[in-house]
Structures are given as structure tokens and as C-alpha cells.
Amino acid sequence: MQAGPSPIEWTEDGRPRFILYGDAYFGADDGLAESRAVFLGGCGLPGAWTGRRSFTVGELGFGTGLNILALLDLWRRAGPAGGRLHVFSIEAHLMPRDDAARALAAWPELSELAEVLIERWPEARRGFHRIDLPEFGAVLDLALMDAGEALAGWDGRADAWFLDGFAPALNPDMWREDLLQAVAAHSAPGARAGTFTVAGRVRRGLEAAGFEVRRA
């Protein structure tokens, strides 16, 4: 069974938008700055991995891969020498390779990382796909399937979570309380999660799952 390719259209200012939900993959101002502030900063990185030889990040909503490139960029600059970064990311609708390359070209500072990721971009085939990134001391496990199924099939625990599904009003399934409970069950002690949304239902769902919610 094939994971459905992501139907993309482009906004006038050059951002990819997912037609099914009518939502852009990142904000109009600066998607990279947004990723760094919301997800890296929201998860206390790089401080959270201080003194660690390995670190695991989980993500709901791989999208263009921008969050992961921002993470890899920080890891290569501020990660532990010889350390290992493991990323587990979930995406139900993988963006076509050419569209991802077009989207990521907006940030030349990430070009080295982007070229490697695009070169190893998997086929849109339902299942778990491992992308080895030894030049950056990292490995990416990309689950192309429903988030609930992906979490049920993963035996890991994340030290940090990037919760980056489309807006709750447009994609409520990504923010279901049972899904947030599963995220909590796959979290290491002291794990932190970053998310762009301040929707009340998401805040309540995170609190019910055991997270302490604070606005950054």
C-alpha cells in the first residue's frame, strides 16, 4: 500500500500549502526562525542534551523536513562530540521530493543538510523508512502512516517532541487526546514538547496526558 503523495499548491509568496487542509507548511515571516523558536527553543535545546551522548527527538508532522534540518544544524554545531541523534518522525502524506527541494531552497544556510536529505528522500510507500545520516551523527526513522499506528509500532522513547501537525481546526485527528496520551507514553522522564498551537483543546489534551503546559 502506498502512502498518499502530498497534494501541494504554492502561495504567492512561495510557500507550499497542503490542499486537503488549505494550510501552509510554515508561516509567512520566516519558517526557519519559527522552527528554531517553537521547537528547538520550546524543547530547551541545545541545553537539554548537555552531558548526554545520545538524544532522541520525536515529531508529529514531518512536512518539508525543515524542523529536522534546523535540529540537525544545531546538533552539528552544539551537539556532543561523537554523540548520536535519533529522530523518529511521522508523516501521513509525504511531500514529493521536488516540492521539498523547492521549499527548502529558501534557506541557503541549510543547503548542505538539505541536499543530503533530499538525496535520501524515501519513496512515498507506507511503512517505516530509515534514513542514515552518519555525516551529521544522526539517524532518521520516518514513519509514513497514521500517527496512532506509527506510535503503536514504535518501541522508543523521545527526550523531546516536535508537535507540528496542521492547525487543530483543520486537522483535528492529529491532536486527539488518545494520540497525545500515546506521545506521553513514548516520552522519556523529563521530556519536553514544543508546539505552535495555543488551542485550548490541545492544551487540555497535553495536560491530561501528563505534560505541564507553559507558554514560551
Give the ranges of each region predicted by the language model.
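Glycine-rich SAM-binding Motif I of class I
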Residues: T64-L69
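Conserved beta-strand signature within the Rossmann-like core of class I S-adenosyl-L-methionine
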Residues: A160-F162, S187-T197
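A short glycine-rich, Lys/Arg-flanked "PGG" loop and its adjoining helix->strand segment in the class I
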Residues: D173-G190
